[in-house]
Each structure stands twice: as structure tokens, then as C-alpha cells.
Amino acid sequence: MDRNDRRIARFTMLGHATFHLYELTIPLFVVVWLEAFDVSAAVLGTVVAVGYALIGIGALPSGALADSYGSKRLVVLSMAGMGGGFVLIAVAPSLPLLAVALVLWGAAASLYHPAGLSLITRGSERQGTVLAYHGVAGNVGTAVGPLVAALLLTFLDWRLVAGLFAVPAALAILVAGRLEFVERTATDPDESTATDADGLSAIVAQSRVLFVGSFLLVFAIAVLAGTYYRGLFTFLPDVLAGLPVFEPVEIAGETFEPSQYAYAGLLLVGAAGQYTGGRLSDSRSPERTIVAVFIALIVVSLSFPVVTSFGLFATVAICALLGFFVFMEAPIHQALIGEYVAADVQGLSFGYTYLGVFGIGAAGASIAGIALTYGGTALLFVALAALPTGGLVLATILLVRSRRPSP
């Protein structure tokens, strides 16, 4: 990587770590909220799904803004809004107001991915490698956030813990503000097509172009992956807490939940998956790689309820495999966008992608809650396995198309 690549990597690593620090800490709070607000998993899952949906709904305008005005300001604004959103969560006195706070958090979080990822695909020379480091940082956030939350929730009230989580965003903003880089490569157009026409009409025209090519398949793959991701992680802490091998342990008068640390460890293993997926995107066909990842996810998902009954070591192993492969997919489909979409509309394409991943994909939280409520863990993982199965079909079509000779 050259100097500009390294600075873009550092900047987006900060933003990505901040995003996932908050995003996957919320499921740990879900365990507490089930009791604090006296609601069922189905109801709370739907409330959380609404908040997560805003990440997707706001992604489309964020992508268009990134094409027109650049990414740096949007990423910094996103980090500030996410920190502020957790302050609002901390003071929410009822379930409806908690839902409002989650919506506001989701709106701020929606700014990150289209802005940050289009910065990488447009501004860096070694896109796959930068995406790999970007993904690793995201998984560090996903692991550190839940781990710190688990420790703090052991000793402190959940409202105080939520308020303290505003501090990481403030620190990230201070560091990010000191990084300077060139957002677009010299080979990109000086002006994006988003600035050549009136805003809405330009977006409509660009969207028509996007959805007549292979991007439609890439978009559908991302939607299925996002639904799987949200369905899995919203209630995974609750699923792990119900396993006999992770029964609570009392140490020095304090009760510790081993399942929370297993959850954090699973997310940390995901960093290796992100890095592997990103590096393979530079050296191998991303179409072939994503096919292999979906096959692995199907096998691991269907095996999970069975393998976790075989004891501690088997449970830890299947959790590690789950974490590795679910996160390996993300940098690969991001690289596919860089491959199939023109540079001047990549912000818009990432906007649509994360509208699908976090907007439509937010339904995964509700699906998971319903499956757990009415069918338990076995039904949950059967339902989840259907999603990478659909992704496998679409990815295979994309692979076949990519191998056809150009006319």
C-alpha cells in the first residue's frame, strides 16, 4: 500500500471499528432489556429491527452525498451521531422511547458504510488489502465493544454503561480529524455524474443504469447476507446463554456469564475471516470465493444446534467457524461492487447495497425472534441456513456469467 492507501485505511478503520463497536453491543443490551422492559423476544426483536432498519434506509442518501461531496465529513458526522445515540438510549425510560433512540442511532450509523466503502474503492490502489484491514478493524470493534459491555454490565447499571459508550466515538473523531488523504484516484472523473444534473433525477438515472447489469445480482446477494447477519447476531448472546456449557459462574460474589465472553471471542475470530476475505479478493476470483463461503455457512448453520450438544470444545469450535465465515463474506461482496460498478457511482451503489443489508436485512431480527419464540434454537438455524442457500444460487449464476467470454 502507498501512503494514501495507508491513511485511507487508518481513517476507515476508525469509522468501521466505531460502527461495529456500537452495532453488536446492542444485542448484549437486548438480554437486559427483555427483563427491564418485560417484553417477549418477538416484540423486542421487532423494536430492534426498526432501529437497525434505519441504517439501511439512510444508506441511499448517504451514498449519493458521498458521490457529490466526498466521504470524510459524512464519516465524522456518523461517528458523532452514533455516540450521541447511545446517550439517548441511556436515558430512555420506556420501550417506545427506547425505539426512538434506536431509530436516531440507526440514522447516524447509516452514514458510515456508503461513505467509507466508496472512499476505499475510489481512493485506494490496493482495494482488497485496504478492505481487509477495514474489515479487521470492524471485528476488533465488534469484539471489544461486547467484551467491555459484558464486563461493565456485570458491575454497573445498563443505563450508565450505555452512557459511557459515547466516549469511544469522541476519541475516534479526535484521531480521524488529524488524518489527511486524497479521496479519489487520479483515474477517476473530476466530477461525478451526481453533480451533473439535479439531485433526484440524477439518482434515478444512475439507478436505472445500476440495476440493468450484474449489480442486481450483487445487490440480492448482499441482502441475503445482511438478513442472515442480523438474524444471527440479534439473539446469538441469548442463544449462547441458554447452552449448558455456558452456565453462569460466581467468582468473589459476582456472577459472570461465560456466554458473553464466548460471543466476544466469536466476533474476534471474525477479524481473521474479514482479513482472509479481503486478501483473497485481491488474489482470487471474488465470485468463486463467495460461492465457497456460502457453502461453508450452510454447513455451519445446520450443524450448530447439533454440535453444541457435544460439549465445551465442540461448542467453541463451531462458534469459531461461524464467526470466521459469516464475516469472511463482507469484504468479498464489497470487492464485487468495486468490480462491477463504475467509480463515479460507487457511493450510490454502496448506498443501495447497505439499504439492502441493513434495511431489508433488518427483518432478520424479527425473523430470528419469531423463530426462537415458536420453534427454539433448531428452527432458528434452519431458517438462517435458507439465506446463504439463496445466496449460493445467485453467486453461482454470477460465477457462470463471469466465466463467459466477452462478446
Please place each PLM-identified region on the residue numbering:
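Extracytoplasmic gate region of multi-pass secondary transporters
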Residues: 26-27, 213-275
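Helix-breaking motifs and short loop linkers at transmembrane-helix boundaries and internal kinks
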Residues: 38, 70, 91-96, 108, ...
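Central cavity-lining transmembrane alpha-helices of secondary-active solute carriers
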Residues: 48-63, 261-276
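Conserved MFS/SLC helix-loop-helix module at the cytosolic interface between two early adjacent transmembrane helices
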Residues: 57-95
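Structural signature of the two symmetry-related core transmembrane helices
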Residues: 73-88, 288-303, 385
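Cytoplasmic helix-loop-helix junction between adjacent transmembrane helices
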Residues: 101-140
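Helix-loop-helix hairpin linking two adjacent transmembrane segments in secondary transporters
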Residues: 134-190
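A late C-terminal transmembrane helix in Major Facilitator Superfamily
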Residues: 338-377
